[in-house]
């Protein structure tokens, strides 16, 4: 069975929405913690461009940039998920249909303390405050994926996924943040396109 045409995009939108809600929920309970970025929250194609990390679009908006992107799509199997399958397809026999694995990248950027206009480095207090925001963001994004991903599949046991490494990125260009990878199983549920054999 093949994937439905919107299988990937619908999942990326669901992950984006889930993480955004989690960031806003955390901001409501942790003093001084920013919520979901107001202006730059989107699914992006390919590698993430660091377009904005500090510019809110209004005085009441939250700055930053939250993105979800696809790193890769590949064949796997029920037994070996998330390992890449090396089974040859299209041969006769009773091989189970392959499972499709999708590696997603969730990236969250915030403003990083930088040098002052007089060339002085950021203070330890500024660095500590930025670290606190980053550390809370790291836990929030991780927990959001753990809690939301099972509910994105309408199966009895929920969606299968494997949390990948989370790493800090930056500071660079006034931005600092995190990148969280997660590999998700996409079960096929669409028929293969009709086509006559050559």
Where are these regions (language model features)?
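Short, solvent-exposed beta-strand/turn "edge" segments of beta-rich domains on protein surfaces
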Residues: 83, 90-98, 169-173
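Acidic-leaning, charged glycine-interspersed low-complexity segments
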Residues: 30-41, 125-187
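Extracellular/virion structural assembly segments
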Residues: 2-20, 95-101, 107-146
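Residue-identity detector for threonine
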Residues: 4, 12, 25-29, 41, ...
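Protruding loop/beta-arch "assembly-hinge" segments enriched in small, turn-prone residues
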Residues: 187-198
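Oligomerization/assembly interface segments of phage tail-like spikes and tubes
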Residues: 98-113, 173-188
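Small/polar-rich, solvent-exposed N-terminal microdomains that initiate assembly or binding
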Residues: 1-93, 198
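Residue-level signal for well-ordered alpha-helical segments
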Residues: 89-93, 118, 122-124, 157-161
